[in-house]
Design a protein with these regions (language model features):
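Class I S-adenosyl-L-methionine
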Residues: 1-265, 297
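S-adenosyl-L-methionine
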Residues: 1-3, 305-333
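Conserved S-adenosyl-L-methionine
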Residues: 36, 40-44, 73, 248-317
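Short, well-ordered coil/turn elements that cap or connect secondary structure elements
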Residues: 84-87, 282, 324
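Hydrophobic/aromatic beta-strand patches that form the interior of the parallel beta-sheet core
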Residues: 93, 288-290, 328-330
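Extracellular structured ligand-interaction cores
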Residues: 112-114, 160, 284-287, 326
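A glycine-rich phosphate-binding loop feature that marks nucleotide/adenosyl-phosphate handling sites
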Residues: 199-205, 272, 321-328
């Protein structure tokens, strides 16, 4: 990471990392293929040293995204606030990481947390509309499908004036838009009038004009689960369970979607099974992946080769991936 700092300082649009988690209780086995038995102070120093460099590498529009478990979340949030800036904190996504839950112990933990920070002027992109959101566009006219936009709102409206309906009924607000704007939209055919006793105007928000929907702070298992991530690895490597908790391509796809555009540079310095770089490749992003463990050659590098050959797992069909491209693999001696 330090060897790349000078060349790529201020050039990274999206940093997405899934670092070793902190655990309060010692693990008998290395659940994450990293040292999972840090003392809290050691783990925080470990993270601080890397976040310091990460901040330097972000562009002014860049975003830093960190995936972490519940046990280390509070401490990492304080550390990241200190390094990246509490005023640069955008929010935390709670991600349902499991298809099911264990019914043993006292409390089932089925979510991980995704912290999002901006360097300076960075902002999140919108996500594609879900099937549920698309169903809201159930009205149609000659211009296409649309959903209704509330204009008469007695709670939030701030404009008071008289408006006459097509049948001559008088409405008095309060309105969400100024009278001149509603009249302009009506003249353009962009007002939907209900009929009957509840006659009132609504704006028309067309499906084809939608740029998507803003991200929210809870992502359910439609964004993928750890089980799905493990299945993707097994499908790539002849059924071998190489990682216990790899992130699914669907989750990383959405994180890359909200934090970058095509051609932008994505960095993951805890590359692990290579999910982030594989998804970045399929999404036409530039990327840098860093991994200190020996399995980089047998897992991440081999996975990228399969991506170039056109493998059809993960998000491939959703993005019409058919293969191609290249990458450079180098070892720091």
């Amino acid at each position: 990471l330090h060897s790349l700092k000078k060349r790529f300082a201020g050039k990274i649009k999206s940093i997405i990392i899934d670092p070793p988690y902190y655990f309060k209780k010692t693990k008998s086995s290395d659940a994450f293929n990293y040292n999972s038995n840090f003392k809290l102070s050691t783990w925080l120093v470990f993270m601080k040293n890397r976040l310091d460099v990460a901040k330097e590498m972000l562009s002014d529009e860049g975003l830093c995204i960190i995936i972490i478990g519940e046990e280390g979340y509070a401490q990492l949030k304080l550390l990241a606030d200190n390094i990246l800036g509490g005023d640069k904190y955008i929010g935390t996504i709670s991600w349902r990481k499991s298809d099911n839950q264990a019914n043993i112990g006292e409390f089932a933990k089925v979510t991980d947390y995704i912290l999002i920070y901006k360097k300076s002027s960075g902002k999140l992109n919108k996500l594609p509309l879900t099937d549920k959101a698309r169903k809201e566009y159930r009205y149609s006219d000659e211009n296409g499908y649309f959903r209704r936009q509330i204009l008469l709102d007695k709670t939030r409206g701030k404009y008071n004036y008289e408006l006459t309906t097509p049948t001559g009924k008088k409405l008095y607000g309060p309105w969400m838009k100024e009278k001149e704007e509603i009249e302009r939209l009506d003249n353009l055919g962009k007002i939907y009038w209900t009929r009957g006793g509840q006659e009132q105007p609504y704006g028309k928000l067309y499906l084809q004009d939608s740029e998507g929907q803003i991200p929210n702070d809870f992502w359910d298992n439609s964004f993928g689960t750890n089980q799905r991530g493990a299945e993707e690895i097994r499908e790539l490597f002849s059924g071998d369970r190489l990682f216990d908790f790899p992130k699914p391509e669907r989750l990383i796809y959405n994180l890359i979607k909200i934090s970058s555009e095509e051609g932008d540079l994505v960095l993951d310095f805890f590359m692990g099974s290579g999910t982030t770089v594989a998804v970045a490749h399929k999404m036409n992003r530039q990327y840098i992946g860093i991994e200190q463990m020996d399995y980089i050659e047998t897992v991440a590098v081999e996975r990228l080769k399969k991506v170039i050959d056109g493998e059809q797992g993960g998000i491939s069909q959703d993005v019409a991936w058919s293969g191609g491209g290249s990458f450079i693999y180098a070892e720091l001696m």
